[in-house]
């Protein structure tokens, strides 16, 4: 599992650097990439959530209940955007302070990671090639089953799933075994380097304790500064939740009346 995590980390770093190479931009730091990734992830969740709400409202059940979830979702999204704007300067100050305090440690770790990445890259290329081969083999095995499913009846769904599961498990096991076999030594090397760095920090005068104390202090300050924005969020959510509650109760009451009338 550690080897898999290392693989994903190296792939993420390598892919990000390649993008800046082709675009001729200044490469982002790992810190900036983490923050950008978090922002993109949150936006994707928000957009996909709105799509699900819209699909539900367009369904027959959604039209019958008439909960107006989409309006409430937009109100909630607007409230969250305002809160994020209020917290922006506070969180930026926190990230800047934390980045400054850990700059030396991150610089050493980036150097170690770059060395490991250079050693691992040939194995990653080989893994990608083998992965494509395994996927093609899996596709060839699954193709007849897919055709059989299309020709069969619905009651064969469970049977098809039972037959597909061993093939999928076989593919996962092969990929995991290959990664662990090829990358485990490099994962151990990186872990040993990190342990050595941390031991050096301990021997150098309690830098780790200082990092922990400063991070705790900054988190406490962040919590105090965020209280007004979080209170605004709570006040903004109350009308949305109340409206949703009223809509649900009205829908239940309407359904009860229809059942009693029958």
Swiss-Prot record:
It is found in: Secreted. Residues 67-262 are annotated as: 10 X approximate tandem repeats. One of its GO terms (molecular function) is phosphatidylcholine-sterol O-acyltransferase activator activity. One of its GO terms (cellular component) is very-low-density lipoprotein particle. GO terms for biological process: acylglycerol homeostasis; cholesterol efflux; cholesterol metabolic process; lipoprotein metabolic process; phospholipid efflux; positive regulation of cholesterol efflux; positive regulation of phagocytosis; positive regulation of phospholipid efflux. SUPFAM superfamilies: Apolipoprotein A-I (SSF58113). This is Apolipoprotein A-I. It comes from Pantholops hodgsonii. The gene is APOA1.
């Amino acid at each position: 599992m550690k080897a898999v995590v290392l693989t994903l980390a190296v792939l993420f770093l390598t892919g990000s650097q390649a993008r800046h190479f082709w675009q001729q931009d200044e490469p982002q730091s790992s810190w900036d990439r983490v923050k950008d990734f978090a922002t993109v992830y949150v936006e994707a969740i928000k957009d996909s959530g709105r799509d699900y709400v819209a699909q539900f409202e367009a369904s027959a059940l959604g039209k019958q209940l008439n909960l107006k979830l989409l309006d409430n979702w937009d109100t909630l999204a607007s409230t969250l955007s305002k809160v994020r704007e209020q917290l922006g300067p506070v969180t930026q100050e926190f990230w800047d302070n934390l980045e400054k305090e850990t700059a030396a440690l991150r610089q050493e770790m980036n150097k170690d990671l770059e060395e490991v990445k250079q050693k691992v890259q040939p194995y990653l290329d080989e893994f990608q090639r083998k992965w494509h081969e395994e996927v093609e083999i899996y596709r060839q095995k699954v193709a007849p089953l897919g055709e059989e499913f299309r020709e069969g009846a619905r009651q064969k769904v469970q049977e098809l799933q039972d037959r597909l599961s061993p093939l999928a498990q076989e593919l996962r096991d092969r990929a995991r075994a290959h990664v662990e076999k090829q990358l485990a030594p490099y994962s151990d090397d990186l872990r040993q380097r990190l342990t050595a760095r941390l031991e050096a920090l301990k021997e150098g005068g309690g830098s780790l304790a200082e990092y922990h104390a400063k991070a705790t202090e900054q988190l406490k300050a962040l919590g105090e500064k965020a209280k007004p924005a979080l209170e605004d969020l709570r006040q903004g959510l109350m009308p949305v939740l109340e409206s949703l509650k009223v809509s649900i109760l009205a829908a239940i009451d309407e359904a009860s009346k229809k059942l009693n009338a029958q």
